[in-house]
From Swiss-Prot:
Keywords: Membrane, Transmembrane, Transmembrane helix. Its main location: membrane. It is found in: Membrane. It is a single-pass membrane protein. It comes from Treponema pallidum (strain Nichols). This is Uncharacterized protein TP_0788. The chain crosses the membrane at residues 7-26. GO terms for cellular component: membrane.
Length: 296
């Protein structure tokens, strides 16, 4: 009887232990090759990532509805972008050179991107990711933004470094390596591979810089001309202002001393009558001269 009781107790203990081991062994709840993140009501996110080949047992899943386990695959996904834009002030420069084609550029870039294992737990917590589709959307959005930014930065470097611009046209591998390093620097939490530059169109940077210099010289000349016109306008305005002030002062003077106006009118009238008298005397003198000559 005691043997049966012991055997029964042993079987029950082994069964309970097996059940507890199965419930708390987190890897058993994940698909093969997947990574897991556990979140519980009692403790929040667990600090360790559940990775394949690493034994991890936790007590939180033993409580009903206490723990959630999110499974993720860190698989590579292809991200592609096509970035099109024009160089700064391209329209003005093209008009100055009478060029019909603008200084536009195009980069079609793709890469294989995967989130690194070391950043999975932090990313899931920060972005509140709960399933594989959400993780893939996050990686795709992040990678597209990085590839777009890298494309703009690459064109800016080609503008600043004519030697790099020449190498891009002659050494395709150099451009892809440069872009790969730039992408890795932009999103260090992702693994980057198979960077492909499927389309590249970069305008003539030598012609662009020539147009830029010509445009700056044109703007400098126009600025000088406008400055000279502004100075002339300022002089005219100053003279007009001076004349206006002088007339204003005379007006105030005559308003204060109105008798001066009468005095000036009297002088003008006396002057006119005096002038008329002089004119009459001059005419009479001219008439008397011939008569005297005849008498002689």
């Amino acid at each position: 009887m005691r043997v049966r009781t012991f055997c029964f107790s042993l079987v029950c203990a082994l069964g309970a232990s097996t059940y507890l081991l199965w419930r708390g062994w987190l890897q058993l709840s994940l698909p093969a090759g997947s990574y897991g993140v556990m979140r519980s009501r009692s403790g929040g996110y667990h600090h360790a990532l559940i990775a394949p080949g690493r034994f991890l047992w936790r007590w939180e899943p033993l409580l009903p509805s206490n723990a959630e386990l999110f499974a993720f695959e860190l698989k590579k996904q292809t991200v592609s972008v096509t970035v099109q834009d024009v160089l700064p002030a391209a329209k003005e420069y093209a008009q100055l050179l009478d060029q019909h084609a603008p200084f536009d550029w195009t980069l079609a870039l793709s890469a294989r991107v995967a989130l690194k294992e070391a950043f999975l737990l932090d990313t899931v917590q920060r972005e509140r990711i709960t399933d594989q589709n959400s993780l893939e959307r996050y990686v795709d959005t992040t990678a597209q933004a990085a590839l777009t930014q890298v494309s703009h930065d690459f064109i800016a470097r080609c503008m600043a470094d004519p030697a790099l611009y020449e190498r891009v046209h002659t050494q395709y591998g150099l451009a892809t390596r440069e872009l790969k390093r730039a992408i890795e620097k932009e999103i260090p939490h992702c693994a980057i591979s198979e960077v492909v530059l499927s389309e590249v169109h970069i305008p003539d940077m030598v012609l662009y810089h020539t147009a830029e210099q010509a445009y700056r010289a044109f703007e400098a000349k126009r600025s000088e001309h406008l400055s000279a016109l502004a100075q002339q306008a300022a002089k005219r305005s100053a003279l007009e202002n001076f004349e206006m002030q002088r007339l204003t002062k005379w007006g105030e003077f005559f308003q204060r001393y109105p008798s001066v106006i009468d005095f000036l009118n009297a002088i003008r009238q006396d002057g006119a009558s005096t002038l008329e008298t002089l004119k009459k005397g001059s005419t009479a003198s001219h008439r008397a001269i011939p008569h005297e000559e005849t008498t002689r």
